[in-house]
A protein has these predicted regions:
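Intrinsically disordered, low-complexity regulatory regions in eukaryotic proteins
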Residues: 1-85, 96-251
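Acidic, turn/loop-rich segments in luminal/extracellular domains of secretory-pathway
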Residues: 91-95
Length: 251
């Protein structure tokens, strides 16, 4: 017998990418029916937000020592799901349908894992899957500049010969036009203490470098002003929007 379920619910967490933006952004999760046979009627799906799912997940899958990594339920003021209580799977259009979620991302913190806890409350025509009716929609934040990069350059200690450095870098978004990375040869980590002491934040400005039309000026500072490295910004750092390449110079 066909059942109605949330795609991703069998893994308990469904991850979706959303961009930092000053405007509301849209993402989706999917309600589907099991099997490959067509539905013989439309299915009305009523869902709800169940905050208890977040606490249950945190207590089951994280230890007390990892409290800073707990999933946090996204504030309901920051999102809306217009069809939450009445999503329709139209049998003439297939066996599933996407559910749009509208989210305000500008104020979200990169080191917090935000989730939206959704649950199917009832359906018409077909039963609800007992193992696929509830899940956490996990938001993975990104922006235009975040992602994986290959760093190549050199460091120079006073009075010494420049030392060549090469290392892959993961650049994390922290806002619409800001990103964070571990500076120089520092190894990447998701531990709070390492982030505080070993990362810098780049701000990609709207100021175009004179003589170009695709190179923006970039400012650099310590991510954590109190615990982070003492950074002196050279004022010469840039981002090439065509090559998608950072050129950073700082002390």
């Amino acid at each position: 017998q066909k059942e109605i379920y949330l795609i991703g619910a069998y893994n308990r967490v469904w991850t979706t990418e959303v961009s930092y933006s000053n405007e509301e952004v849209k993402t989706y999760f999917t309600v589907s029916s099991s099997g490959t046979l067509a539905l013989d009627r439309d299915v009305n799906v009523k869902m709800k937000i169940n905050e208890e799912l977040v606490d249950i997940y945190n207590k089951k899958y994280w230890t007390v020592l990892n409290e800073d990594k707990y999933y946090k339920s996204l504030d309901t003021d920051l999102y809306s799901i217009p069809s939450l209580e009445n999503t329709v799977i139209k049998h003439a259009e297939g066996i599933s349908t996407e559910v749009p979620v509208l989210i305000k991302t500008a104020s979200l913190k990169i080191d917090q894992s935000y989730v939206i806890p959704v649950e199917i409350e009832s359906t018409t025509g077909y039963p609800v899957s007992t193992s696929g009716y509830k899940m956490l929609v996990l938001l993975k934040l990104k922006n235009e500049y975040s992602g994986s990069y290959q760093m190549s350059g050199h460091t120079t200690l006073e009075g010494e010969t420049p030392k060549t450095i090469q290392k892959p870098k993961t650049i994390k978004p922290t806002g619409v036009n800001t990103v964070r990375l571990f500076y120089a040869m520092n190894n990447e980590s998701d531990e709070k203490a390492d982030i505080q002491t070993g990362t810098i934040e780049l701000t990609i400005t709207d100021q175009i470098v004179e003589g170009t039309n695709d190179v923006k000026k970039v400012s650099i500072k310590a991510w954590d002003a109190e615990n982070g490295p003492a950074i002196i910004d050279s004022g010469e750092s840039t981002y090439n929007t065509t090559a998608k390449k950072f050129s950073l110079k700082y002390t």
